[in-house]
A protein has these predicted regions:
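Residue(s) in the substrate-gating loop at a strand-loop-helix junction
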Residues: 135
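Alpha-helical segment proximal to the catalytic Tyr-Lys
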Residues: 119, 164-168, 227
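Active-site helix of classical SDR
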Residues: 114, 151, 159
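Short C-terminal tail/terminal secondary-structure segment
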Residues: 219, 230-248
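Short, small/polar-rich loop/turn modules that mediate ligand/substrate recognition or access, typified
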Residues: 80, 167, 172, 229-231
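Active-site loop immediately N-terminal to the catalytic Tyr-X3-Lys motif
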Residues: 92, 140-146, 168-169, 206, ...
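Substrate-binding pocket helix/loop in short-chain dehydrogenase/reductase
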Residues: 90-91, 98-100, 199
Length: 248
């Protein structure tokens, strides 16, 4: 895969990010898996990719990350901004440091990574693809995670802005918005029968999605099959956003 295009996936040590990396690897990309956790190295080795450590809330670290990738592997053709956190808390006394931390990773980090990847794409004439991880919580709110909901709404709008700004360079920018996906973030819901029943009552397909189902949509958006798709957020939610009543 010496001449394979380079794809970078953040938050790739597990869950949705790892599934995105797997799908892109199958599509012929050389995948750089990025995470703040050391376990990203094993995940990358198992996949035949490259693991790198980066805190996506640290602007300087993001710059250094892309410097290293470009120097050691070449310019990036596809970027998947998946890294994100959710820090719960009461709206009335939500900690501002927590708010800033969520925004720095979930929104500012996405912006900075897009800027850096896109600048090189423009310079090298690469007609690349960027996919950002939004959420159904860009559209529907959960009071206990105010910063997360706000950040994912921001990602949705920032995706549109970037898509319009980069269209003249044939760089496509899209987002995906997962619903209830069977990952570690949903482990608490899955372990609680009542909570799981409530989540499924709002999901017409009646089941959780899999991380790979998200990864496959991301890979599609990075592919030439989606060559006329830009500025969109595709919701992978089992029909949840279209529902205006509770399923029995």
């Amino acid at each position: 895969m010496a001449d394979a295009p380079i794809a970078v996936v953040t938050g790739a040590a597990q869950g949705i990010g790892l599934a995105c990396a797997e799908a892109l690897n199958e599509d012929g990309y050389k995948v750089i898996l990025v995470d703040v956790q050391d376990s990203v190295h094993k995940a990358a080795a198992d996949l035949g990719g490259v693991g790198m450590i980066c805190d996506m809330g640290d602007v300087d670290a993001i710059g250094a990350l892309f410097d290293t990738i470009e120097a050691e592997h070449g310019p990036v053709s596809a970027l998947v901004n998946n890294a994100g956190i959710a820090m719960p808390g009461s709206f009335l006394d939500y900690d501002l440091d927590a708010f800033d931390r969520v925004m720095n990773i979930n929104l500012r980090g996405v912006f900075v990574a897009m800027q850096r990847a896109a600048a090189t794409m423009v310079e090298k004439g690469i007609e690349g693809a960027i996919v950002n991880m939004s959420s159904i919580n860009a559209q529907v709110a959960i009071p206990a995670i105010p910063a997360y909901c706000a950040s994912k709404g921001g990602v949705m709008q920032l995706t549109k802005v970037a898509a319009l700004a980069l269209a003249k360079n044939n760089i496509r920018v899209n987002a995906v918005g997962p619903g209830s996906i069977d990952t570690e973030m949903m482990a608490g819901v899955n372990a609680n029968p009542e909570a799981f029943k409530m989540a499924m009552s709002r999901t017409p397909l009646g089941r959780s999605g899999t991380a790979r189902e998200v990864g496959d949509v991301v890979a599609f958006l990075c592919s030439k099959k989606a060559s006329y798709v830009t500025g969109e957020t595709i919701y992978i939610d089992g029909g949840r956003l279209g529902l205006n009543y509770v399923m029995s």
